[in-house]
């Protein structure tokens, strides 16, 4: 009888230990990857600011980040206590080997480095898909929340974001806009399916441009016949947008990244095409924060910030 009791006790102890061990396992599953660790990661490296922004929003702190200018809710990462290893495009492999992170995140600009990082530590690609902006943001947020046990916090943040978006869409109902990406004196209109065209899904502004026909053609070399043809097409597209008389012109000024110096605020007024638009003449122009829209992008807190710029 005593032997049987001891045997049962041993089984129960084994089950308990296995349960504890299993509950300690960290699991992060995406469509393409399934990351499993024996414990929750203590040293995290992040090479995409939209991911860093979402982690930060969920009170999950990275220890290793790229050399970059951190703004907004990410300003603290400028501090020396956070190790800088590589850039947003190229993580420093040698430095990471010495630092031995438990988990590495890549996405967007750094996504191509996934395979080179995997021998160093578990690495996951959480690149944003802005062609379905909000659903993708929610999926990536919930993926992180589940892995790091932040479900309640994520649910509240996402609910607040939904309410904010609804408020913005109430204000933009039946209003149109053209999204412009400005590089110097060159203003490039972005249709709803272009890189920054997600603003239409995000804010509810109707686009005045037709959807762009997508190609795999590389950007033409400056000064080439192809580049001149593309420039001419761009001017025609601008003229077409102005003729549609958009209620608002929205400008993302590349030159203001890391400087917050918006030369386009003056340049747009004297632009041969845009200067003739009613939106510009009547000061219905929104210059969005260049760091937020161009560098940080589709993060949880940053998306709320971007919506508030339009509200």
Question: Which sequence ranges carry the predicted segments?
Answer:
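Bacterial Sec-exported substrate-binding components of ABC uptake systems
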Residues: 3-5, 11-12, 16-50, 152-184, ...
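Alpha-helical, coiled-coil/dimerization segments enriched in small aliphatic residues
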Residues: 69-73, 192-231
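Proline-aspartate-enriched helix->loop->beta-strand connector
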Residues: 97-106, 122, 241, 245-251
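Extracytoplasmic substrate-binding proteins
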Residues: 116-187, 284, 289-311
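Structured C-terminal subdomain patch of bacterial secreted/periplasmic proteins
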Residues: 135-136, 244, 248-311
